[in-house]
């Protein structure tokens, strides 16, 4: 059974304590009424995993855990079988005691693009919105963050996160809550807020930016990564039924338009720090994610376009400050 008591105890002693006015009731409601039909199966998988304290843990360059003595072939096979029960694995990769989880996304590449532009994360309390399996939260801890809190309503991601955490010795420096940002009160408590790969899924992108701002302390930093298209400050793509086979894509602005949106929401010191085309090396089918991936969503005769004829995925990273 996945338990949030450790997180409640942790925030009871810090500047997130006011969250306890609403959070336990929300989680209790989720446990009672909103659990996925496969959640028990997934959470049982986490229960069956051994809790291992890493002898060597590298979160700075990767998410890699090693034991002092190599695990037996049987132990490795058991861990691998259990982790495969939590497929598909989309965000990673993870290297855990000889089990190498080759995820759909090379999320480490994104982190390498983002990290050089961030304010020093040392000692910071961080919110990661739409955090997936939590890969980037572990990298935030590796970069010196005091606490990383992720929110993502996808319950498989919660179980993937808890599985990795258990194999990292039940590390309590990162926590994932099965919530969407619209369920958070205006906490105004995080030094840095990340929203990566979320904005284009929101029906109201400016409302999302306001919600992100409401989570930041004054002078806090927003890290926003999202799909963009080429164009000036007035360019926004509103796809039809699907974009790259995704139904839930609503607005894809140019990076300059996105900069204006941030300005309209009251952010300052807005910087476009990276723009790059997503490649089929960065997002692809693997043994740990065996269904369709990016190559299936692009025009086979012209990979600069999606199968629907839109520009192929390009992503920008913007950094801004809440005054």
Curated annotation (Swiss-Prot):
GO MF assignments: transferase activity, transferring alkyl or aryl (other than methyl) groups
Leader sequence residues: none
Gene3D superfamilies cross-referenced by the UniProt entry: Vaccinia Virus protein VP39
UniProt cross-references to SUPFAM superfamilies, sorted A to Z: S-adenosyl-L-methionine-dependent methyltransferases (SSF53335)
Protein origin, superkingdom: Bacteria
Residues the record lists as binding carboxy-S-adenosyl-L-methionine: 91, 105, 110, 130, 152-154, 181-182, 196, 200, 315
PANTHER family listed in its UniProt record: PUTATIVE (AFU_ORTHOLOGUE AFUA_2G14390)-RELATED, TRANS-ACONITATE 2-METHYLTRANSFERASE-RELATED
Similarity section: Belongs to the class I-like SAM-binding methyltransferase superfamily. CmoB family.
Protein name, entry field: tRNA U34 carboxymethyltransferase
């Amino acid at each position: 059974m996945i338990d949030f008591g450790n997180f409640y105890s942790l925030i009871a002693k810090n500047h997130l304590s006011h969250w306890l006015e609403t959070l336990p009731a929300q989680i209790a409601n989720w446990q009672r009424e909103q659990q996925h039909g496969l959640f028990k199966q997934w959470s049982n998988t986490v229960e069956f995993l051994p809790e291992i304290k890493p002898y060597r843990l590298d979160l700075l360059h990767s998410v890699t855990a090693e034991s002092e003595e190599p695990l037996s072939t049987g132990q490795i096979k058991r861990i691998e079988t259990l982790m495969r029960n939590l497929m598909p694995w989309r965000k990673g990769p993870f290297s855990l005691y000889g089990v190498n989880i080759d995820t759909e996304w090379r999320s480490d590449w994104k982190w390498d693009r983002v990290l050089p532009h961030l304010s020093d994360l040392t000692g910071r309390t961080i919110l990661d919105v739409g955090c997936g399996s939590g890969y980037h939260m572990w990298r935030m801890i590796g970069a010196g963050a005091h606490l990383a809190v992720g929110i993502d309503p996808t319950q498989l991601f919660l179980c993937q996160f808890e599985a990795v955490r258990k194999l990292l010795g039940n590390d309590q420096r990162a926590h994932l809550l099965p919530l969407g940002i619209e369920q958070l009160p205006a906490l105004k408590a995080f030094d840095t807020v990340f929203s990566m790969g979320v904005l284009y899924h929101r029906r109201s992108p400016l409302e999302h930016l306001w919600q992100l701002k409401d989570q930041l302390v004054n002078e806090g930093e927003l890290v926003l990564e999202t799909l963009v298209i080429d164009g000036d400050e007035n360019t926004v793509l509103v796809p039809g039924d699907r974009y790259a086979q995704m139904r839930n894509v609503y607005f894809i602005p140019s990076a300059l338009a996105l900069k204006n949106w941030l300005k309209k929401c009251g952010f300052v010191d807005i910087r476009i720090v990276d723009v790059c085309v997503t490649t089929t090396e960065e997002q692809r089918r693997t043994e740990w994610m065996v269904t369709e991936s990016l190559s299936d969503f692009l025009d086979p005769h012209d990979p600069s376009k999606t199968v629907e004829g839109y520009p192929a995925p390009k992503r920008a990273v913007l950094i801004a400050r809440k005054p």
